[in-house]
């Protein structure tokens, strides 16, 4: 099976997610990704020609109540305790700084 090096992709994804990975974690996660890919390749080799297709593996039934529209609070009521409103929305402080 084809082996891929996932380290660079992991570094890029971790950077975008603002995660710090140690070199040991990078090695571990790269190996785990390769193992997952290898497993999917094994699954592709399984002969399913005599298997009847299913929409879902479990029988699904809705055990919950029916959704019914109900009244809601007014926009004024929703905004009355908001510290700041901007463009008909709640304004909150920025929590992620952009890197230039």
Swiss-Prot record:
The keyword Nucleotide-binding is assigned to this record: yes
Catalytic activity: L-glutamyl-tRNA(Gln) + L-glutamine + ATP + H2O = L-glutaminyl-tRNA(Gln) + L-glutamate + ADP + phosphate + H(+); L-aspartyl-tRNA(Asn) + L-glutamine + ATP + H2O = L-asparaginyl-tRNA(Asn) + L-glutamate + ADP + phosphate + 2 H(+)
GO terms of molecular function: asparaginyl-tRNA synthase (glutamine-hydrolyzing) activity; ATP binding; glutaminyl-tRNA synthase (glutamine-hydrolyzing) activity
Keywords, alphabetical: ATP-binding, Ligase, Nucleotide-binding, Protein biosynthesis
GO biological process, one term: regulation of translational fidelity
Record EC number: 6.3.5.-
Cross-referenced SUPFAM superfamilies: Glu-tRNAGln amidotransferase C subunit
NCBIfam families named in the record: gatC
Protein family according to the UniProt entry: Belongs to the GatC family.
Record HAMAP family: GatC (MF_00122)
Quaternary structure (record): Heterotrimer of A, B and C subunits.
Role this protein plays: Allows the formation of correctly charged Asn-tRNA(Asn) or Gln-tRNA(Gln) through the transamidation of misacylated Asp-tRNA(Asn) or Glu-tRNA(Gln) in organisms which lack either or both of asparaginyl-tRNA or glutaminyl-tRNA synthetases. The reaction takes place in the presence of glutamine and ATP through an activated phospho-Asp-tRNA(Asn) or phospho-Glu-tRNA(Gln).
Protein name listed in UniProt: Aspartyl/glutamyl-tRNA(Asn/Gln) amidotransferase subunit C
Organism: Dictyoglomus turgidum (strain DSM 6724 / Z-1310)
Source species taxonomy: Bacteria, Pseudomonadati, Dictyoglomota, Dictyoglomia, Dictyoglomales
